[in-house]
Amino acid sequence: MSQSKFALPRNGFTFKQFFVAHDRCAMKVGTDGILLGAWAPIAGVKHVLDIGAGSGLLALMLAQRTDHDVQVDAVELDEEAAAQARENALASPWSSRIEVCQADIHQWQPSQTRRYELIISNPPFFAEGVPCATSQREQARYTTTLDHASLLTCAAEHITEEGFFCVVLPVDIGNAFIERATAMGWHLRLRTDVAETELRPPHRVLLAFSPTAGECFCDRLAIRGPEQQYSEGFTALTGDFYLFM
């Protein structure tokens, strides 16, 4: 989504209600994260946990979407990214509701004994690949520090019985993630396949799992319409966030 109509800060991304600086983060604000933050179910949510928070994008989006008494905890391993996420939260309208912690999620415990109705993560995609220019980028891109089995285990330790654990992944990796999650006792409850247009195959999948079994609702979202304009579905989902939508 272009932000070129006005002179906006160049070290991040300006949304309607907040700004995300991301120049000190390995992974920048992108469509995947924005889709996930806008899509995750929030009915009945009182506590949100963002695993691998990066710049704090998801924590900020969920703070905007939820009631004034909802607490959002964001955990990020990388020191620089966690510091920037904390600064972004402090500069937002919801600074009193967002707590950013620099920690390894495997060792982290919430400041209060609680479980979360919503856990959200935009996790590393790939098991291995071409070495990255920095260890920070490698940590964000590859599952070397947070593999998917460990992520599912961590989420299970912190979620309520009726809660949802939501991720966004490439379709092929998402299908493998579903198999792994199912084998570990999770139940897929929501699935949205995301394609660039109606005529193209999906390239991303939004997934919501729960410890509790129930019907699984599946649908499809095209980002653009036949004339390359943003589709009605994409606009309805993300319109509260994109500045010029």
Swiss-Prot record:
Its main location: cytoplasm. GO terms for cellular component: cytoplasm. One of its GO terms (biological process) is methylation. The keyword tRNA processing applies. It is found in: Cytoplasm. Keywords: Cytoplasm, Methyltransferase, S-adenosyl-L-methionine, Transferase, tRNA processing. One of its GO terms (molecular function) is tRNA (adenine-N6)-methyltransferase activity. Its EC number is 2.1.1.223. Pfam families: MTS. It catalyses: adenosine(37) in tRNA1(Val) + S-adenosyl-L-methionine = N(6)-methyladenosine(37) in tRNA1(Val) + S-adenosyl-L-homocysteine + H(+). The keyword Methyltransferase applies. PANTHER family: TRNA1(VAL) (ADENINE(37)-N6)-METHYLTRANSFERASE. Belongs to the methyltransferase superfamily. tRNA (adenine-N(6)-)-methyltransferase family. Specifically methylates the adenine in position 37 of tRNA(1)(Val) (anticodon cmo5UAC). This is tRNA1(Val) (adenine(37)-N6)-methyltransferase. It comes from Klebsiella pneumoniae (strain 342).
